Amino acid sequence: MNTSFRIDINSHTLISNEMTTKGSCCVANFLTPQQLSELKEQVRTDAAKHNGQYFAHHGGSEIESSLLGVLGAAPEFRQLLASLYQAGAGKSAFNDEVLKVLRCVQGNSGRRESNCFHYDASLVTVLLPIEIPQNGTDRGDLIMFPNLRPVRSNVLFNVLEKALLQNALSRKLIAAAIRRHLLKPEKLQLVPGNLYLFWGYRTLHANEPCDPASRRATAIFHFGDPHAGSLATRLILKLNQRRARRATVLGTQRAV
């Protein structure tokens, strides 16, 4: 396993500036071809276990025993995350926990997980595409409204915003407005092996639908919850993890 990653400690300020001014920053060819191939093989194995339907891992042995676990524990990667949080929040993160997610959108069940606009709980979001359709219209592109809001000083404002936007009706209205060109989000066609960084807490984002015959697999690293330690934050995290487990189970059951 090749555990050397392309991280330049001198680029932290540049990355932070691009996240703020452009909405996101892309580190091209972050993974070597060998590393990308290794992760793709892991995804294929997992996809077969879930009968070609949607699944997501929130931490756990599937991630920690893989290259994703190695990356999440790499000192230079953790230093990058801490530096970005400091730049974005003006202070150090409450703790150094890195939440790692492996998400795979595939099959008919995957469409239910598209256009689910949301704000992340963490300030810093790092997206590592593993397998992404590169042709056609339904590629599962990342759509985002960058830096719509600041870091809220009160957790209740954060909860209220999430309640207003992260529900089925609001998401349908946003998706409809985009189709009618009333709203014009940024759109990123993700390239496997590149690394994408943005202010997830401040950016309303989702993925577009993915062709059921294709697979969209991404690793996501979350760092720095501005409201860490609050009861509301703990409840939101538990609800999100429960929802992900339920979506995985439903996708597998419906394929049987």
Question: Residue locations for each model-derived region?
Answer:
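A short coil-to-beta-strand element that immediately follows conserved catalytic motifs
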Residues: A87-K100, G140
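Catalytic core of non-heme Fe(II) oxygenases with the double-stranded beta-helix
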Residues: Q106-L195
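Histidine-centered active-site/metal-ligand motif
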Residues: H118, H205, H222
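Short beta-strand His + acidic residue motifs that chelate non-heme Fe in jelly-roll/DSBH
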Residues: T203-D211
